Amino acid sequence: MEIDDLTGRELDMAVAKHVLGYEVEERIDTTTGEKDAFSRPRGQGKGWVRVASYGASMGASLNVEYELQHRGWRRRVTGTVKEPTTLAEVILDHRDGRSVKAVGESRGQALCRAALKALAK
């Protein structure tokens, strides 16, 4: 699946694994009985937690932005979404001159897609 096609939990799992470096597994959530995604920092033994909703939660997406900054990427400030039908756009610039752009239904979704593109380069 292409990065620009990732949404929902698939996007969250990809971010947890490829951006944040977590181990990620799909498991049955014992509280709901439904299949969901869980992660833990690599080499941490126990301690699996539900993968955060990086594409939907502004708070969770801040972790993505902090990790990108640590790796030399900065989010370029762009215009705000003016129409509900307009896709959100995120542009990331690296200190070495590289840039990536992604769009999404929300700024968080666009940030997650841009992060995956940036770290795939």
Each model region followed by its residue ranges:
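Glycine-rich anion-binding surface patch
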Residues: 1-121
